[in-house]
A protein has these predicted regions:
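PP2C/PPM-type serine/threonine phosphatase catalytic domain
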Residues: 1-246
């Protein structure tokens, strides 16, 4: 596997409230995390960092994530646990009231690939040159799409497309959605909405399919393209690619 991750404040925000990492354990399992924080007085920065630190530590404490059943429970339990920590932190630090964060995670073992998400950070898989969105956003417009009141195209330009229905820190009990992707995937991409609000899936796919670019150059180019279009938000990308024979 080849991996690379990068985060950028963008062109408008004075500081970066995203956090991102990719970890590999001794069993050859990978954990990719992107978290997009929110809240004043740098509270969002704290929230997203808490998520990445907590999940990273829990992952590093494991010898292996075990079976698919074990891994699913591990994702649910640890995302629920860090949600409680964020809620508690906000209650003990009044200046951080309203703090929260999205999270999207990919957990890859030799036998399965799982995604978990809360909020509107996105998890994608690449298969045969096609970029497929795996996760569903916890937003008002996504609910309207699922109800048949909006088309996917209308949702892209809806004035309330960034209104979250669920995030870590928002309420006492939060359970992530879990998705599985079969092992025929070619690559995994996670991103904050700073990428997906600026670039269409087709534009992202085009960059990822460029044979002239290294994995690092692809991630850098995605972020540069977002900034060239205004860079209105922090932008974070975590990218994992299968090498030939894997």
């Amino acid at each position: 596997m080849k991996t690379f991750y990068l985060t950028d404040a963008g062109k408008v925000r004075s500081h970066n409230e995203d956090s991102v990492t990719i970890l590999k354990n001794d069993a050859g399992e990978y954990l990719l995390i992107v978290a997009d924080g929110m809240g004043g007085h740098r509270a969002g920065e704290v929230a997203s960092s808490m998520v990445v630190t907590h999940l990273g530590k829990r992952f590093n404490d494991l010898v292996t994530v075990g079976t698919k059943y074990d891994a699913t429970n591990w994702l649910k339990d640890n995302i629920s646990e860090i949600n409680h920590h964020i809620v508690e932190y906000a209650s003990n630090n009044p200046e951080s009231k309203g703090m929260g964060t999205t999270v999207v995670v990919a957990l890859l073992t030799h036998d399965f690939l799982l995604y978990a998400n809360v909020g509107d950070s996105s998890g994608f898989a690449m298969k045969n040159g096609h970029l497929l969105k795996v996760t569903k956003d916890h937003t008002l417009v996504q609910l309207l799409v699922q109800a048949g009141d909006l088309t996917e195209e209308e949702a892209k330009y809806h004035p309330k497309k960034n209104v979250l229905m669920k995030a870590l820190g928002g309420e006492e009990d939060v359970v992530p959605d879990i998705y599985e992707v079969d092992m025929s995937f070619d690559a995994v991409l996670l991103s904050s909405d700073g990428l997906t609000n600026m670039l269409s899936n087709e534009a992202i796919e085009k960059v990822l399919n460029d044979p002239e670019l290294s994995i690092e150059d692809k991630v850098v180019k995605l972020i540069r393209k977002c900034n060239a279009r205004g860079g209105t938000d922090n932008i974070s990308v975590a990218y994992l690619v299968k090498e030939s024979g894997e």
